[in-house]
Regions:
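Conserved alpha/beta-hydrolase "acid-adjacent" motif
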Residues: 233-239
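Short beta-strand/loop motif that positions the catalytic acidic residue
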Residues: 220, 226-228, 232
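Conserved alpha/beta-hydrolase catalytic His-Asp/Glu region
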Residues: 131, 152-207, 216
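Gly/Ala-rich beta-loop-alpha elbow adjacent to hydrolase catalytic centers
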Residues: 97, 101, 105
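Active-site loop/oxyanion-hole signature of alpha/beta-hydrolase fold enzymes
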Residues: 40, 44, 55-94
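Catalytic active-site module of serine/aspartate enzymes centered on a nucleophile-bearing elbow/loop
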Residues: 250-284
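Flexible "cap/lid" loop of the alpha/beta hydrolase fold
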Residues: 110, 117-150, 200
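Conserved HGGG/HGGXW glycine-rich cap/lid loop of the alpha/beta-hydrolase fold
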Residues: 5-67
């Protein structure tokens, strides 16, 4: 994958297909699992390559992109996305922000609407750091401890658990193989590299803490598509419904019985592809 130096950081990216540009902002919070055993994003094979130029990239402190211990906000992460578009000579693009990529996409669309043809928000919400969910409190506590005790002290407390991958109940052979690779890689990685990944993950958590776009959703004027699984255990389906209610002109595509990682479901892929093709037909 090529790299681009933008907004003070080196980003790894990939571009597939030709046509109307679409930028995919991935989810997750970076860290060791994304770098030692990168995932393949389903969107890469979802869209017609003769009509859409799909651009995928690793956010800072994730995947093969640069790790930094600097503090930043979602404005910074949206600036990274814009910087990549500038690097590629792209003025406007369809933006797809999945899961933790959703708030970044919202920041980009609200701050620079002239750069966004249309916006898709799969399995995400306006405030992912909400204390309504246990993960929100856990991540906030981790950030606060990192600030008060220091990154190295927090790493010393977490090191053993960081070397054990989060269990997966996936039945997909490719994901099972990835988990096995990750398990071995986490045992082999040096403490110095694991510390770097740990700090990067915490910095990503921090960027979301005060980011709540609920009150500004009505400002969005571009076409908006929301895709959410009704059985999502990570980002509740109700959060997707809340986006739809607040963005009056948005489309809502519920995917029955689907969990998180919605774009890997056939129904979601069909909904996304259909929406993108309708958007393209209007701008062509």
């Amino acid at each position: 994958m090529p790299f681009a130096d933008v907004n003070g950081v080196r980003l790894s990216y990939e571009s597939v297909g030709e046509g109307v540009p679409l930028l995919f902002i991935h989810g997750g919070y970076g860290g060791a699992a994304t770098t030692l055993a990168p995932q393949t994003h389903a969107i890469k094979t979802t869209l017609p390559r003769d009509k859409v130029r799909t651009i995928l990239y690793d956010r800072r402190n994730a995947g093969l992109s640069a790790y930094t211990d600097a503090h930043y906000t979602l404005k910074t992460l949206a600036g990274d996305a814009l910087g990549l578009l500038d690097h590629l000579g792209i003025g406007k693009a369809i933006i797809v922000g999945s899961s933790a990529g959703g708030p970044i996409a919202l920041e980009l669309a609200l701050s620079h609407p002239e750069r966004v043809i249309a916006l898709c928000l799969p399995n995400t919400g306006a405030n992912l750091a909400s204390l309504e969910r246990p993960q929100g409190k856990t991540r906030r506590d981790l950030v606060e401890r990192s600030k008060s005790d220091g990154d190295k002290a927090v790493f010393a407390q977490r090191k053993a658990s960081l070397r054990v991958p989060v269990p997966s109940d996936s039945k997909d052979p490719a994901e099972i193989a990835r988990q096995e690779h990750l398990k071995a890689a986490l045992q082999a990685v040096s403490d110095d590299d694991l510390l770097r990944y740990s700090i990067g993950e915490i910095r990503n958590y921090e960027a979301y803490l005060d980011a709540d776009y609920t009150a500004r959703l009505g400002e969005l004027k571009m076409p908006v598509c929301i895709i959410h699984g009704t059985a999502d255990r990570v980002v509740p389906y109700a959060w997707g419904e809340a986006l739809h209610k607040a963005i009056a002109h948005s489309e809502m595509h519920p995917i029955p019985d689907a969990d998180h990682g919605i774009l890997s479901y056939d129904g979601a892929a069909v909904a996304l592809r259909d929406w993108v093709e309708r958007v393209i037909a209007k701008v062509a």
